[in-house]
Amino acid sequence: MALQCGIVGLPNVGKSTLFNCLSNAKAQSANFPFCTIEPNVGVITVPDERLNKLAEIEHPQRVIPTTVEIVDIAGLVKGASKGEGLGNKFLANIRETDAILHVLRCFDDDNIVHVDGRVDPVRDKEIIDTELQIKDLETIDSRIAKVQKQAQTGGDKQAKIAYEVLCKYKEALEQGKSARTVSFDTKDEQKIAHDLFLLTDKPVMYVCNVDEASLSLIHI
C-alpha cells in the first residue's frame, strides 16, 4: 500500500500548484480561497537506484517501483476545528494520510489574495498547528471520558495504561505542543498512542513557497 502524503496549508498558498508539480496533474489552481473542495489525488513513483541494481541481478519479469500517493486537501482557516470554512471535512481528510506536507506562503504579491490580509509564514504555521492541536485535544478529552472511571476504579491494566497515555498527550496539547513531541517507553504505551491516529502525531515537512527573486537568498 502506497504511503499517502496530504498537502495542507491556508487557502491560496500554492498547495494545488505543488500538487500539480509533484504529480504532473492539472488540478485547478486559482486566485481565490477554497479553489479546492474535494481532495485531488495523484500517484508518483519513487526513483531508487537500488531497485535497478537488484533487477540487473535477478532479472524479474517486471520492476515495480515504490509509489507515494499525494493528496491536495482543501485550505484550512482559523476556527477550522470548530467547523469554520471546510474545517471538519478538511480535518477528516488529514486524518486519513500518513504524513503532512505543510505549504507556507513566503512571498509578497498584491495580485494574489491572502486570507489574513498579509504574508506571515510563522503566523500561518501557528494557525494550522493550533487548529490541529485543538482537534487532537477534543479527541483526547473524549477518550479520557470513556476510560477514566475504568482506569481509576477497576482492575483493568490496559485502561490504566491508556489513561496515562491520554493524560500525557493532554498535558502537552494544552501547552501548545504537538503530539509528535511526546514519547513513550513501553510497547503497550506506543501501541495505544499509535491507535489514537492523532493529527499532530503525523510526520510533517514544511514547504516554503518563495518567489524567484528570493531563490538566490536561500542557503541550504
Question: Model-found features: residue ranges?
Answer:
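Conserved small/polar residues in nucleotide/adenosyl-binding loops
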Residues: 218-220
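Generic beta-strand/beta-sheet core signal
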Residues: 8, 207-208
